[in-house]
């Protein structure tokens, strides 16, 4: 997986105001050794989109992203119940 991150500054600010999470902080979800990556099949009309579920500050963060060349392009992040539930279910399965 690429190790460079990028994002739109205006989307970052909008996400921070709406969900209380900036994209710089969202990068930390990828550092969780037990993170889970899942394809977002519901919103992949033009390009493939993914979710990263990882623990940041003791809570499960969901990061929405796509791959652009050698970069991970973040376009959404937050602490959502559905993301936490999916992360916990996958941890039980993969253990």
Predicted regions and their residues:
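Ribonuclease/tRNase effector modules and their secretory precursors
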Residues: 1-95
């Amino acid at each position: 997986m690429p190790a460079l991150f990028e994002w739109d500054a205006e989307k970052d600010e909008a996400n921070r105001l709406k969900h209380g999470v900036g994209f710089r902080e969202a990068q930390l979800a990828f550092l969780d050794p037990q993170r889970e990556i899942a394809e977002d099949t519901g919103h992949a009309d033009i390009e493939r989109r993914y979710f990263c579920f990882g623990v940041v500050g003791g809570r499960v963060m969901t990061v929405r992203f796509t791959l652009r060349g050698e970069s991970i392009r973040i376009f959404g992040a937050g602490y959502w119940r559905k993301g936490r539930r999916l992360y916990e279910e996958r941890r039980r399965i993969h253990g």
